[in-house]
Amino acid sequence: MELPAVNLKVILLVHWLLTTWGCLVFSSSYAWGNFTILALGVWAVAQRDSIDAIGMFLGGLVATIFLDIIYISIFYSSVATGDTGRFGAGMAILSLLLKPFSCCLVYHMHRERGGELPLRPDFFGPSQEHSAYQTIDSSSDAAADPFASLENKGQAVPRGY
């Protein structure tokens, strides 16, 4: 099944709107968590070729799914008393229900940008960003022993004291 072509800006707009309405009743950590992840989404929009930006946005969306479940389950009974409380809680729940679908769409965008599945042992290692930078050394032997050529030419090898 082919995923629909959805712009990242639409995903951000929908989640921003639902988070704003959810903040009518859920404030503090709910707002900080969700708006921080939306800021990562803005970064992913601004840098269209960045694998790190879209990857961090995807990871943040997954994290906020769990955080929203915990936050809504703890505070729902105390805030959903009036009409405004029920509306805000409903929008937060709707945002939570849309996040797995958004994660699928963002993961598809992550793959289009050249990203890989982030479940591998060296995930926290060097970045996957590709640049035009090339090293000066063409051989790996020169990097392993930089003074090997000096000994072969009869020159004195510098010593560290």
From Swiss-Prot:
| Chain positions found as Phosphoserine | S127, S138
Question: Does this entry carry the keyword Transmembrane?
Answer: yes
Keyword match Isomerase = no
Question: In what way does this protein cross or attach to the membrane?
Answer: Multi-pass membrane protein
Q: Which GO terms describe its biological process?
A: regulation of blood pressure; response to hypoxia
Q: Tell me which residues bear Phosphothreonine.
A: T135
Residues annotated as region Interaction with AGTR1? 110-122
Going by the entry's taxonomy, the superkingdom of the source organism is recorded as Eukaryota
Pfam families reported for this sequence:
AGTRAP
**InterPro entries, A to Z:** AGTRAP (IPR009436)
Which GO MF terms does the UniProt record name?
A: angiotensin type II receptor activity
User: For this UniProt entry, what is the primary localization, expressed as one broad class?
Assistant: endoplasmic reticulum
| A GO term from the CC aspect | plasma membrane
Query: Which keywords annotate this record?
Result: Cytoplasmic vesicle, Endoplasmic reticulum, Golgi apparatus, Membrane, Phosphoprotein, Transmembrane, Transmembrane helix
Biological role stated in the UniProt entry:
Appears to be a negative regulator of type-1 angiotensin II receptor-mediated signaling by regulating receptor internalization as well as mechanism of receptor desensitization such as phosphorylation. Also induces a decrease in angiotensin II-stimulated transcriptional activity. May play a role of negative regulator in cardiomyocyte hypertrophy induced by angiotensin II through an inhibition of p38 mitogen-activated protein kinase pathway.
> Can you say what this protein is called?
Type-1 angiotensin II receptor-associated protein
